[in-house]
């Protein structure tokens, strides 16, 4: 069984160059590959296209890469919690492609399945449909959406083994799982790295065949996106 372990985030990110397209896992502020984002900032790679459900917040997640102006284009679904994202988008500094959330996840999965495109009714009759091919099937219109082509996918898992098998935890599974299948090279950072064979096969969410590099992450934060307390 192939050992896919690398020493750290810096080693895992080798080969990422200016102008590449990267899938970045996470949902809200959970399941974010924090170590890899920090390493990308130090690496200084720029003009990136990032595919992610959201853009983090101003001082966490992809918001950190927006602060350093390393992202050229965001392909996302929900971006409403990041003031710096809004500023860059409205000023024309940042290209933005907003995609329905289900379509975003499916375009990631289709890349992993090797399926080049798929039909969906989501977005028909809206700006999402502009410039896209449409078909009519049994009296209903569908958009033709293409699978993503990402140079790298970077995800964070709860547990992983040295062969690259991954288990995600609760909501953090949301986009990490489909993205872990969709990159030409997939990098996984994990909270707990175990020997191959330690994970129960029926609990594995992403088989190691999709994962190329894995490393033990450290110092993860447990951020709260919006703190709400009861009023007395």
Which positions does each model-derived feature cover?
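Conserved alpha/beta enzyme-core scaffold
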Residues: 1-232
């Amino acid at each position: 069984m192939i050992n896919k372990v690398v020493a750290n985030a810096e080693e895992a990110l080798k080969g990422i160059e200016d102008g590449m397209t990267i899938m970045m896992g996470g949902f809200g502020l959970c399941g974010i590959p924090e170590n890899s984002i920090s390493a990308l900032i130090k690496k200084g790679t720029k003009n990136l296209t990032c595919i992610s459900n959201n853009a983090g917040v101003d001082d966490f997640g992809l918001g950190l890469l927006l602060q350093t102006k390393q992202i050229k284009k965001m392909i996302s679904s929900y971006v409403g919690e990041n003031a710096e994202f809004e500023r860059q988008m409205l000023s024309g500094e940042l290209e933005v492609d907003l995609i329905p959330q289900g379509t975003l996840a499916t375009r990631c999965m289709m890349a992993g399945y090797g399926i080049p495109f798929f039909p969906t009714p989501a977005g028909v009759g809206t700006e999402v449909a502009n410039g896209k091919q449409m078909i009519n099937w049994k009296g209903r219109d569908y958009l033709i959406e293409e699978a993503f082509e990402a140079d790298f996918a970077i995800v964070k898992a709860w547990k992983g083994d040295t062969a690259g098998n991954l288990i995600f935890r609760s909501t953090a599974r949301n986009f990490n799982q489909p993205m872990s299948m969709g990159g030409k090279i997939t990098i996984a950072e994990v909270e707990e790295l175990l020997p191959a064979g330690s994970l129960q096969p029926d609990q594995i969410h992403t088989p190691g065949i999709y994962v190329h590099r894995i490393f033990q992450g450290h110092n993860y934060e447990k951020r709260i996106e919006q703190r709400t307390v009861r009023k007395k």
